[in-house]
UniProtKB/Swiss-Prot annotation:
This is Two-pore potassium channel 1. Belongs to the two pore domain potassium channel (TC 1.A.1.7) family. Disruption phenotype: Reduced growth in both high and low K(+) conditions. Slower germination and increased sensitivity to abscisic acid. Reduction of the total tonoplast current density. The chain crosses the membrane at residues 79-99, 137-157, 198-218, 251-271.
């Protein structure tokens, strides 16, 4: 009797089968949940789930789908608007005092715009000269404000115009190779300043040729005199013995003088930056090729645990190359400590949510 009781199961067989099926179902469900939790890289961000009203990390529209003017850099658009305002006000002011400006004149509005451009770019031919106290004070005000505006144009407009030609130059230098968009971006990133120098030099040569041809064809200058006038204009020397005298010539000069003088200044700026970049690359090459010593390992051990990890080694190398300094690292670490709400030494979704909650409460 006792042996039969021992062999008899405590639960019926059907009950055991049902429990086993439930256990298998729960185990599969929990394992699938674990798998879903491990796939954190593809999961939605916690801050998106926390606040649905805030749109974060929306991809910007593709540049090809944006109108041309809206594709411009906001700073460049602002400079263009200031330039248009400057030329409008300057033309109006110099037109009103046109009787107080002596020299060879053609049309009132064209002469006023031409004098405004010549003043802003500091070319100063001398073919139009203010001859009264009011006109001279006005010219002084516009020459200083114009130099400031030209400085902004140097750093904004020339970059925009040159970058449009960089991809074409890469294709031209590699005509025999199959260069796709990825290869072009990689090549531009590697030799960005070099291609900027090439593009600016090409634009400058075109402007020299166009200016010389125009002076020969329209202003009826000899070739040498036309080239001399182009050089004195682009370099803003403006001796004054050769200049634009016709109405069509001065209208052409309004656009040509501004473009060519800015282009030349930007070319020299790119050359200086290229020399600096070459020195920086030489330093990087030296850092990457020299052998690591024990002193280097001690300096790279940021947490002083006797072991240098990949992150510590990368930070040390970047500091040695001059890419970052101690201030950059301390600033990033301060941000990390602020986000690490539970002080675990790692960042999780809950840390970000708690940090956002705290910042919203403080507001």
């Amino acid at each position: 009797m006792s042996s039969d009781a021992a062999r008899t199961p405590l639960l019926p067989t059907e009950k055991i089968d049902t429990m086993a099926q439930d256990f298998n179902l729960n185990s599969r469900t929990s394992s699938s949940r674990k798998r879903r939790l491990r796939r954190s890289r593809s999961a939605p961000r916690g801050d998106c789930m926390y606040n649905d009203d805030v749109k974060i990390d929306e991809p910007p529209p593709h540049p090809s789908k944006i109108p041309m003017f809206s594709d411009l850099n906001p700073n460049l658009r602002r400079v263009i608007m200031f330039l248009a305002l400057y030329l409008t006000i300057g033309t109006l002011c110099f037109y009103l005092v046109r009787d107080q400006i002596s020299g060879h004149k053609t049309s009132g509005v064209v002469d006023a715009l031409y004098f405004c451009i010549v003043t802003m770019t500091t070319v100063g031919y001398g073919d139009l000269v203010p001859n009264s106290s009011a006109s001279r004070l006005l010219a002084c005000a516009f020459v200083f404000s114009g130099m400031v505006l030209v400085g902004h144009l140097l750093s904004r407009a020339a970059d925009y115009l040159v970058e449009k030609q960089e991809a074409l130059l890469v294709r031209a230098f590699h005509l025999r190779q199959s260069f796709g968009p990825t290869d072009i971006l990689k090549e531009l990133h590697t030799n960005k300043l070099r291609y900027k120098c090439y593009a600016t030099c090409l634009v400058l040569v075109v402007l020299f040729i166009v200016g010389t041809i125009f002076l020969v064809m329209v202003e009826k200058m000899p070739v040498i005199s036309a080239f001399y006038c182009v050089c004195s204009t682009v370099t803003t020397l403006g001796y004054g013995d050769k200049s634009f005298n016709s109405e069509a010539g001065r209208l052409f000069a309004v656009f040509w003088i501004l473009t060519s003088s800015i282009c030349l200044a930007q070319f020299f700026l790119y050359v200086a930056e290229l020399n600096t970049e070459n020195k920086q690359r030489a330093l990087v090459k030296w850092v990457l090729t020299r052998r690591i010593t024990n002193n280097d390992l001690e300096a790279a051990d940021l947490d002083e645990d006797g072991v240098v990890g990949a992150a510590e080694f990368i930070v040390y190398k970047l500091k040695e190359m001059g890419k970052i300094d101690e201030k950059d690292i301390s600033g990033i670490m301060d941000e990390f400590e602020q986000l690490d709400y539970d002080e675990s030494g790692t960042l999780t979704t809950s840390d970000i949510v708690l940090a956002q909650t705290t910042s919203q409460i403080q507001r």
